[in-house]
Amino acid sequence: MNAQALVLTDNAANKVRQLRDSEGNDDLMLRVYVTGGGCSGFSYGFNFAESVNEDDAEFVNGDVKMLVDSLSYQYLVGSVVDYVEGLEGSRFIVQNPNATTTCGCGSSFSI
């Protein structure tokens, strides 16, 4: 898997650092995944992991790692993971060039 296939922006990396520091756990990594569901067919998911699974691809921004499993990777290749703060609240988002349709909330897509 190409290590440049996904990008974690500086804003997203800074938020992960902030959350990692508040937990007091420097081993936490951001896991991004795709699951079935949502109004457009697929949904993005985010959580924190302390270990790398055998089928994970790793993407790095400074001292922050982002993990993507091999199934999700095929849907996320070329994507940019960012963190935004706005009127709808603060959240991680995925800018996915493979998505042909996205819903208004930005967390569901189709290919």
Curated annotation (Swiss-Prot):
One GO term (biological process): iron-sulfur cluster assembly
Cofactor: iron-sulfur cluster
The record's free-text note on cofactor binding: Binds 1 iron-sulfur cluster per subunit.
InterPro entries assigned: FeS_biogenesis, FeS_cluster_insertion, FeS_cluster_insertion_CS, FeS_cluster_insertion_RrpA, HesB-like_dom_sf
Pfam families, alphabetized: Fe-S_biosyn (PF01521)
Quaternary state and interactors: Homodimer.
Function of the protein: Required for insertion of 4Fe-4S clusters for at least IspG.
Similarity annotation: Belongs to the HesB/IscA family.
Entry protein name: Iron-sulfur cluster insertion protein ErpA
Organism whose genome encodes this protein: Acinetobacter baumannii (strain ATCC 17978 / DSM 105126 / CIP 53.77 / LMG 1025 / NCDC KC755 / 5377)
The gene coding this protein: erpA
